[in-house]
């Protein structure tokens, strides 16, 4: 069987990994073996955190809505329940933005939900 030299293929594979590892500290960005490990870990973290980001933002929005709702004398769960009963279709992201950017409008949303 003939010998197969992996010149082009191996070099392209290594350069792809090193290109992904650009900006990593020390040998993690310049030596192939350590760069390969760091890139694999970075890709795993990125995959996991893309899903975690959705949870984190939802928690942040809920915390902001709860804080603003309590200023208006109602708890978060009561507010969300009242909004559903009043058929006010506004999502948590928009409610949180209203609470931060325009508290008067948020207060009017709360009063419309109460009545």
From Swiss-Prot:
Q: Which GO terms describe its cellular component?
A: ribonucleoprotein complex; ribosome
**Keyword vocabulary terms for this entry:** Ribonucleoprotein, Ribosomal protein, RNA-binding, rRNA-binding
Please tell me whether the keyword S-adenosyl-L-methionine is annotated for this protein: no
Could you give a single Gene Ontology term from the biological process aspect? Answer: translation
Q: Name one GO molecular function term.
A: rRNA binding
Answer whether the UniProt record assigns the keyword rRNA-binding to this protein.
yes
| Pfam families in the cross-refs | Ribosomal_L20
Q: Where is the signal peptide?
A: none
Looking at the record's lineage, which domain of life comes first?
A: Bacteria
Q: Which family does it belong to?
A: Belongs to the bacterial ribosomal protein bL20 family.
Checking HAMAP family in the record gives: Ribosomal_bL20 (MF_00382)
Protein purpose: Binds directly to 23S ribosomal RNA and is necessary for the in vitro assembly process of the 50S ribosomal subunit. It is not involved in the protein synthesizing functions of that subunit.
- The name this protein carries in UniProt is Large ribosomal subunit protein bL20
Report the source organism.
Prochlorococcus marinus (strain MIT 9303)
């Amino acid at each position: 069987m003939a010998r197969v030299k992996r010149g082009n293929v191996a070099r392209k594979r290594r350069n792809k990994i090193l290109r992904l590892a650009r900006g990593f500290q020390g040998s993690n960005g310049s030596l192939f073996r350590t760069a390969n490990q760091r890139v694999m870990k970075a890709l795993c973290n990125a995959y996991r955190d893309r899903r975690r980001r959705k949870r984190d933002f939802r928690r942040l929005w809920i915390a902001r809505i709860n804080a603003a709702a309590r200023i208006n004398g109602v708890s978060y769960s009561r507010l969300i329940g009242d909004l559903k009963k009043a058929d006010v279709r506004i999502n948590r992201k928009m409610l949180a933005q209203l609470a931060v950017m325009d508290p008067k409008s948020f207060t009017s949303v709360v009063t419309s939900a109460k009545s």
